[in-house]
């Protein structure tokens, strides 16, 4: 008998690091965690710091921190000053020159939050890919999460890149986002944009489908002799179905005349509708970045201008948009010193 004695192959530092990152622990780290955790920590830390202490007086002429009297709904990390252009505003860059106070004043926290937030979201998406691969799942969770990433990147990065500066991006705050929505409406007529319409249909349609699906499953749960309670009559290892797809199919067939007969197609549809809505709306935002126009019904505008008695909901909205522009241009860009005489301000035909 021959016995072969060999040395165990030495493992390099990469293999050791790979094992440590993928170790089973309470909070999985993984290779994606190298990107996710530092970026998420820094983005959230910058946002909390900005909303607590940093003023927007030097960038927007506004108070935007708890220290100045704002609350959770009105505090924000504001976008940089228009004069900063598309500079990344590094702390050590020519704008701040290593001065942290000056860096905060010119809007450095916004670029810091936006860029680290973007990479943090991408890291979270990669985390779902990585864990799905390790446990043998399909990557549809990560594919679905690409929708929110597309919206975030298009709104906070691509839109201002198409405009004059980061100044035109939304600031990170609740009321600040509302102001940005009014800006999109006034300057781009966003609500009449077909990509916005498809996005709304996708998001609200997804919410409707989610509600219908959850209610239908609850309605068709099988009763369990031991525990008929909705939340306890199920174990992950049970072999039988927990609800009746046949009953659900018959119910909706009677309601609408049609119903999903295939669970796979049903759940793919639940995935497809909202994710497509998110992607389409992000494409629309990229169009706005390039100043592409929405629907224009010029014939109605011309007729309304010539005939005082003719007005449509469209022409009224156009007048509202003009009012938003006239107000925002002066208020939101004080450095431009816009002055609008009374005769150019919009008025409806009824006035």
From Swiss-Prot:
Record: residues binding a plastoquinone: 213, 260
State the Gene Ontology BP annotations: photosynthetic electron transport in photosystem II
Which residues are chlorophyll a PD2-binding? 196
Which superkingdom heads the taxonomic lineage of this protein's source? Eukaryota
Q: What family classification does the UniProt entry report for this protein? A: Belongs to the reaction center PufL/M/PsbA/D family.
- Membrane topology of the entry: Multi-pass membrane protein
Q: Where does Fe cation bind?
A: 213, 267
Instruction: Give a GO molecular function annotation for the protein.
Output: chlorophyll binding
* Broad enzyme group: oxidoreductase
Please tell me whether the keyword NADP is annotated for this protein.
no
Q: What is the official name of this protein in its record? A: Photosystem II D2 protein
Which regions span the lipid bilayer? 39-59, 123-139, 151-164, 206-226, 277-293
Its main localization is: plastid
Q: Give the species this sequence originates from.
A: Cyanidium caldarium (Red alga)
Q: Which reaction does it catalyse?
A: 2 a plastoquinone + 4 hnu + 2 H2O = 2 a plastoquinol + O2
């Amino acid at each position: 008998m021959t016995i072969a004695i060999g040395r165990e192959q030495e493992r390099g530092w990469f293999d050791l690091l790979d094992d440590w990152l993928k170790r089973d622990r309470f909070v999985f780290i993984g290779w994606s965690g190298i990107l996710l955790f530092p970026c998420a920590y820094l983005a959230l830390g910058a946002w909390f710091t900005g909303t607590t202490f940093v003023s927007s007086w030097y960038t927007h002429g506004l108070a935007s921190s708890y220290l100045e009297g704002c609350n959770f709904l009105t505090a924000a990390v504001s976008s940089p000053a228009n004069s900063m252009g598309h500079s990344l505003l590094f702390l050590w860059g020519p704008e701040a020159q290593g001065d942290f106070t000056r860096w905060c004043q010119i809007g450095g926290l916004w670029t810091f939050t936006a860029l680290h937030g973007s990479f943090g979201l991408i890291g979270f998406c990669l985390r779902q890919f990585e864990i799905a691969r390790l446990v043998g799942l399909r990557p549809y969770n990560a594919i679905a999460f690409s929708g929110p990433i597309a919206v975030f990147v298009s709104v906070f990065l691509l839109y201002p890149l198409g405009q004059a500066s980061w100044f035109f991006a939304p600031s990170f705050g609740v009321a600040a986002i509302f102001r940005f929505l009014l800006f999109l409406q006034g300057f781009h007529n966003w609500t009449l944009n077909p990509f916005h319409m498809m996005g709304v249909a996708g998001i609200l349609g997804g919410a409707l489908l989610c509600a219908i699906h959850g209610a239908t499953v609850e309605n068709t749960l099988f009763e369990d002799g031991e525990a008929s309670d909705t939340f306890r009559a199920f174990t992950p290892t049970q072999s039988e179905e927990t609800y009746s797809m046949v009953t659900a199919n018959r119910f909706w067939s009677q309601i609408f005349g049609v119903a999903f007969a295939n669970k796979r197609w049903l759940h793919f549809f639940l995935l497809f509708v909202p994710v497509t809505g998110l992607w389409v709306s992000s494409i629309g935002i990229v169009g706005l970045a390039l100043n592409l126009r929405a629907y224009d019904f010029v014939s109605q505008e011309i007729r309304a201008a010539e005939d005082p008695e003719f007005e449509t909901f469209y022409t009224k909205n156009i007048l509202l948009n003009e009012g938003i522009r006239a107000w925002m241009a002066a208020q939101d860009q004080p450095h431009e010193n816009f002055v609008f005489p009374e005769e150019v301000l919009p008025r409806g035909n009824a006035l």
